[in-house]
């Protein structure tokens, strides 16, 4: 039997039910009033289990919205599959996350990725947050529509992307050009680091161009999810 995870939150569960992952069962609190989700689960012939409020909160806590889905664990896409899937497209954007450890940041980034039509996210296996229950909830279901690849070595991955015809940008405060001046046409990958450490020195060296978001206030860095959102929407603007 494949590994399962619990998905919390009405929006996240609604997207799970519309997606392709196998849903083992839905568990609801007897005080829940959401016929849409219940009817959708019944339509897909997914078992529904009801618990009284005390038992439900005891098992799952009080931050679930009164509903939990037991779902097949998220399946990462292999890098070569991600590249092949987008091989015939003229314009492609991959987002590479270097050292991002906050699940709330990753969840928010996945929302921006889905909203902008970004073609995929690449995260390292080590020193990085994984796709967990918090990420799923914060993404409000966006995770169901985004390809995420987990790789062993980011620098090797960047080299492979370059060989496949991708231009790799790194987002850093020390970037040589303003992010609005970058060319987002064709196949590109954009590396975003954590707000604490930024992009590692070796990854910076492997990027083709370092770009920056100008800072006009006293604080010299943005939240990683905000930075990612700004860059992704700029890429879309340039593509018309």
Q: Can you annotate each of these PLM segments?
A:
Residues 33, 128-134, 197-203:
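Short, glycine/polar-rich helix-capping loops at beta-to-alpha or helix-loop-helix junctions
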Residues 169-223:
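Active-site/ligand-binding-proximal alpha/beta "capping" segment
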Residues 31, 53-55, 126-128, 195-197, ...:
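Short, acidic/turn-prone active-site loops that include or flank metal/cofactor-
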Residues 18, 46, 84-177:
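RNA substrate-binding interface of SAM-dependent RNA methyltransferases
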Residues 59-72, 139-142, 151, 185-193:
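Short basic, glycine-rich beta-strand/loop surfaces that mediate nucleic-acid
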Residues 1-84:
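N-terminal positively charged helical leader segments and presequences
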């Amino acid at each position: 039997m494949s590994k399962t995870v619990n998905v919390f939150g009405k929006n996240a569960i609604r997207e799970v039910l519309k997606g392709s992952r196998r849903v083992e069962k839905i568990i609801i609190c007897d005080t829940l009033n959401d016929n849409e989700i219940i009817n959708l689960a019944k339509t897909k012939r997914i078992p529904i289990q009801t618990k009284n409020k005390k038992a439900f909160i005891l098992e799952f806590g009080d931050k679930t919205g009164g509903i939990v889905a037991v779902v097949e664990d998220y399946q990462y896409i292999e890098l070569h599959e991600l590249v092949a899937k987008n091989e015939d497209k003229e314009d492609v954007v991959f987002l590479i996350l270097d050292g991002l450890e906050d699940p709330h940041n990753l969840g928010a980034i996945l929302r921006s990725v889905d909203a902008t039509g970004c073609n995929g996210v690449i995260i390292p296996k080590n020193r990085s947050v994984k796709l967990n229950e918090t990420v799923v909830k914060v993404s409000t279901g966006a995770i169901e529509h985004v390809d995420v690849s987990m790789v062993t070595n980011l620098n090797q991955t960047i080299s492979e992307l370059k060989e496949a015809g991708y231009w790799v940008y790194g987002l850093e405060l020390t970037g040589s050009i303003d992010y609005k001046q970058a060319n987002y046409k064709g196949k590109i990958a954009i590396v975003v680091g954590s707000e604490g450490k930024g992009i590692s020195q070796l990854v910076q060296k492997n990027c083709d161009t370092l770009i920056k978001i100008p800072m006009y206030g006293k604080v010299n860095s943005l939240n990683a999810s905000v930075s990612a959102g700004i860059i992704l929407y700029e890429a879309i603007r340039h593509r018309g």
